[in-house]
Amino acid sequence: MKKSICLYFQVHQPTRLRTYRFFDIGKDSHYYDDFANRTILRRIAQKCYLPMNQLLLEAIKKHKGAFKVAFSISGSALEQFERYFPEVIDSFKALAATGKVEFLAETYNHSLSSLASESEFRHQVEKHKATIERLFGVTPTAFRNTELIYSDAIGEEAWNLGFKTVLTEGARHIMGWKSPNFIYSNPIQPRQKLLLRNYSLSDDIAFRFSDRGWSMWPLTADKYLSWVKESAKDDEIVNLFMDYETFGEHQKAESGIFDFMKALPGEFIADGEFEFVTPSEAARKHKAVADLEVFDPISWADEERDVTAWLGNELQQEAFNKVYAMTEKLSIVNNPELWEDYGHLQESDHFYYMCTKFFSDGEVHKYFNPYDTPYEAFINYMNVISDFQIRLDEARAALDVKETMENEIKNAPVKKAPAKKAPAKKAPVKKAPAKKK
């Protein structure tokens, strides 16, 4: 049996907030930097999404379906594609039409809801699943959480939503001596299969490809194939997971990244040792070799491979607790406009911008970050949250007034109409006696 290569890309663009000052609170409830969102989205579409989608489409056709890939595209990104650059949606539809591309489910707003609210997590995943079905005509059967965040409990929640296959990080501190180049199972739900990212080989492309100071530069397709073969010498599958913006945005076109990706499928297919598979195909093809216990959440972020990139300091924790404390009240109010804003305010990027880690991962945290400091990001976000809280409280108060009035009307005593008196009987008219003649 051939060994498997599973190539997966994350596609996400956040809904960036405008500069929102203290004096805007209670006066202006438009929170978003529409100009920045449109400008950045269109730039990345032209540099990455459109050319890379075309490259993948040509590779699928050239290799007669032997080349396969998988995507997860956040709802926040899909909304911006539809609003600012519909051609991107069309290019993903063309990939979907080949039948060789799998679209995964995730949280609609690329949120941290899996760490805070089971009901909100379920709501977002189901909303995202419905959106993928509407746009691409396929139903997601595999799941990847925001930034590959995973734990045994999160896996169980995904299982309860119908997902038997989950992607996550092959983090060193939970793997120990185990290799990420096998499929594992969730100990709570043993039939749920876990695909683990080979972070070393993935990051060779995502982060080190254009680094001229890297001892292995330049990276060519044949060299990369030899590394994958060595890594999987005694193993079954190599999972290469990375941001889609790697191609043309993080790694510029001048670096040769598109030429590399154009050559890569042919190198693997010609070698004959590997075959490309989608995540769901991998889960069907390979058996789980063992349970993988993950008590505390892991992710693919930073050296720690945990959730400290979003919740590692007091600023992040305060903002996180503040926004998720509103979930219950919002579910009572059930206002569509508030729900839409609430989704955007949950985007994990807002908390990522507040990260104070500036060591080996500092440059990663600065990329796409509109703020000069984490404190500026925190203040701006909390100003927006304060205005949102006012709107939510007002909506709840209006609902209370409405319910009170309805109850008063419902419980008001019914007044009986006074009984009508019977009309007085008239005395019979006495006829005058007839005159005697």
Predicted regions and their residues:
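Generic structural signal for well-ordered alpha-helices
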Residues: 53-57, 89-93, 122-132, 155, ...
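Acidic, His- and aromatic-enriched active-site or binding-groove loops in soluble protein domains
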Residues: 88-105, 122, 126, 138, ...
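Short, charged, surface-exposed secondary-structure boundary motifs
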Residues: 114-116, 174-182, 204-206, 287
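Short, well-structured secondary-structure segments
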Residues: 2-9, 15-117, 141-144, 164-169, ...
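Active-site and substrate-binding clefts of carbohydrate-active enzymes
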Residues: 2-50, 182-192, 196, 211-214, ...
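Intrinsically disordered, polybasic Lys/Arg-rich low-complexity tracts
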Residues: 410-437
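Catalytic domains of cell-wall/extracellular-matrix polysaccharide-remodeling enzymes
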Residues: 126-180, 246-264
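CE4/NodB-like, metal-dependent polysaccharide N-deacetylase domain
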Residues: 118-147, 227-241
